[in-house]
Structures are given as C-alpha cells and as structure tokens.
Amino acid sequence: MVHIGDISSSDYKIQAKEVWRVNPDGEIRDTFQKLYNVFEMKEVEFFEYYNKKKQDYSNSELLIAYHQEEKEILSRMPEFPFSNIWIASVTAKKLPSNSVLHLGIRNSLRSWNYFDTQETVTGYSNTGGFGIDGSLSTVIGAALCHPDRLYYCVLGDLAFFYDMNALGNRHVPSNIRILVVNNGLGFEMKFPASWGYSIANSIGVSEDNYVCAAGHYSSPDLIKSYVYGLGFEYLKVSTKEQYLDCLPKIVSNEKQDRTLVVEIVVNSENEDAALNLIGSIMVDESNVAKAAIKKAIGKKGINAIKKMMGR
C-alpha cells in the first residue's frame, strides 16, 4: 500500500503486506504497523516514475474478477427508499462533465461512494479530523478559484448548520449547487454499528436525545429563510417524485445567476433501511453462519468456548 498521508484518525487497520510512505518530509510514520520503505519526495514525482514502468493489466485475472463481481452487484441493486443512497443512485452518473463533487463526511461520503460518476467528474471530501469539517467552506473556496467549472456539495443537515456562516460571504459564486440531505439528526451516531449508539445503549439512554441531536432546528422554514435572506435560489423536496422533477435543474450544464440550495427532507428510518439494503446485496455465507451461532449461544456461551480453547 502506498501511504501519502500524515496524521490519521482511522479506527481500523488496512491489512497490507507492505506499506510505502511517500512524503517530502521523509519521516518514519508507521500508521499501519507495516512500514517497509520511505520515499522522501512528492507523490507526483513518485507516481510519474512508476507510471512510466506501467504494465498492461487489462487481462489480469484479479482485475477481471473484480469487474465481474462489480457487474453482479450492480445487477442486483434493489429499489432504495428515499434516502441519501437513493439520491446518489439517481444523480451520480448525471453530474455534468468536468464538474466537481464535494461530499460531507460519513453518511454522504459513504452513500455516494457506492455509485460511479463520469470519469471527468472530480471528487473530494474535506474529512479533517473526521468531524463535521468545513465542506461548505471548502467548496466555496474551490469554486471561487475555478469559476469555469460547476461545483456540487452534498452534505447532511448537521454539517450544513456547522458551516453555514460560510454562505454569508459576499463573494459566494453562482457556480455552486448545494444539496442538503436533512434527516433531522446525526444519523451516523444512530445506527447500531456506530460508537454513538453503543455509548447511549450502554448507559441506557436514548441516542436520539443525547448523542444524535434529534429534533434540532426543527423549523421547516429555517434553511429556506436563511437561503432566501442571502439571495440564493432555494428548492425543497420530500419525495422521490419531487426530487426527480427538479433533477434536470440540478444537473443542468447551463450557468445560473445564483447559487442553488436544495433541501432534501428524508427520515432516519429510510436512511437505515437503504444502508442495510445496499450492505446485504452480496453476503458472505460463512459470516452469516458465525453471526447466527453467536446469537444462539450468547455472550456467556462465547466466553465459555474461548475459555475452553485457552483464548
């Protein structure tokens, strides 16, 4: 694995046999505990050098297997409920050529990563320290630097409120289209695999009230009034039909004279259902069997077996 980063907030380890760190600082930073080589250079120089040595992998068995599996997964895509995942599924491929997509972290980033855009569309996500970090500020700055390109920003309601002051800048350009997927809470902290859910569950309180900020800014006119007050164009949708009606405007290649903000109202139940659907398109049967056994024997049974096995 080629590692070009510095500080990482990753809470998991990528299982690579070797890690090559490429960075002008030349420092030894063994993030993944598999560091093998350090290249004291810019990543552009590194990849330019190895790109000249490239081989033809078009007939690689591994690449062919990946393509076949991708094809199989796409053929099994279900109909998703109205959610960030559904929005991505009907929008990603329609983004205009040479446009730029900025994604809010966690839910938006994950949802849109499931679907391809055109090859000429560039994607970014300002993850920062993996909190709700300035994606709105980032896209505004980028759009100012490149007025000839169309910029999209897809983010959740909490990320929008966190960085909404950026829209008050008098120089916000008209080549930005912002999609605010408003599910009324911090969904990332709600679903069972999350830390927020685990913490709330362990102390017997509602994750909605104490972790997810459910019901925050519940006025249906808050974003609308703010956006109108700044002189931008505002659209609001709460069904698939309404979204599909305004989709041509969202993905239009024509220049507009005002920044466009689309508030998309979804609910957390649909977000959760869509995530479960897309995560179970292809299931490893061995993992299903293990989960069933664990559920059947319970935690005490698992601990007893571990004790018998000396683990």
Q: Which ranges hold each PLM region?
A:
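Thiamine diphosphate
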Residues: 114-311
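Glycine-rich, acidic loop regions that bind phosphate or pyrophosphate groups
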Residues: 1-67, 170-171, 184, 193, ...
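Short, well-ordered alpha-helical microsegments
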Residues: 9-12, 47, 88, 109-112, ...
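A short acidic, often aromatic-flanked loop/helix-cap motif at beta-alpha or helix-coil junctions
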Residues: 27-29, 43-50, 109, 131-132, ...
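Generic structural signal for well-ordered, non-membrane alpha-helical segments
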Residues: 43, 59, 63, 80-88, ...
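Short glycine-rich anion-binding loops that position phosphate/pyrophosphate groups of nucleotides
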Residues: 1, 6-9, 25, 106-108, ...
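Redox-cofactor binding/interface segments in oxidoreductases and associated redox assembly factors
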Residues: 3-4, 21, 103, 153, ...
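Active-site diphosphate/adenylate-binding microenvironment
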Residues: 67-146
